[in-house]
Regions:
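Non-catalytic N-terminal targeting/anchoring module and adjacent flexible stem/linker
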Residues: 1-10
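Glycine-rich beta-alpha loop elements in corrinoid/cobalamin-binding modules
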Residues: 48-159
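Short, charged N-terminal beta->alpha structural module
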Residues: 32-58
Length: 159
């Protein structure tokens, strides 16, 4: 489902959070899954996305997809798509952001690499969230519901 005209579903915003797949590297931990943890599908679950989901207002509908475990939906039932990532995930993260934006979704970029260099994401995301989510995600959610999300949210305090 693509977004409604006002950007939200009638029963509350639907948010899809995506953890992009890791390229084959040390950070993909495929070696650990083969050698140390046979039968397991992931070593490092996306706990940052679980934190974002917990910070959303209770009437929001949140789904988390870890692309290292399952495929991302091409036409999700969502009003907003958030794609987070680390530096090693940059290529796939920006690919996903650009795709979902091109097909009509509002997209938000976040994660540790976004926090280090938010300017790299300005061209592929409607909103860039730089910094610790605990400080800025609730404000983004309020602004999104009012139909006035900013292009950049930067956390200025410390955790």
């Amino acid at each position: 489902m693509s977004p409604s005209a006002d950007g939200m579903s009638a029963s509350g915003p639907r948010l899809l959070l995506i953890n992009p797949r890791f390229p084959e590297s040390f950070w993909s931990f495929r070696w650990a899954l083969r050698e140390v943890l046979p039968g397991k599908r992931a070593v490092n679950p996306p706990l940052g996305l679980a934190t974002l989901a917990a910070l959303c207002p209770p009437h929001w509908h949140v789904e988390i997809v870890d692309e290292n475990i399952e495929s991302v939906p091409l036409r999700p039932r969502a009003d907003l798509i958030g794609v987070c990532g680390m530096g090693v995930q940059f290529s796939r993260q920006t690919e996903l952001l650009a795709y979902y934006r091109k097909v009509g979704y509002r997209v938000v970029a976040g994660g540790s690499y976004v926090s280090l260099c938010p300017e790299l994401y300005e061209s592929c995301a409607d909103t860039v969230v730089a910094g610790e989510a605990e400080h800025i995600w609730p404000q983004f959610c309020r602004d999104f519901e009012r139909g006035r999300p900013q292009a950049l949210y930067r956390e200025t305090g410390t955790v």
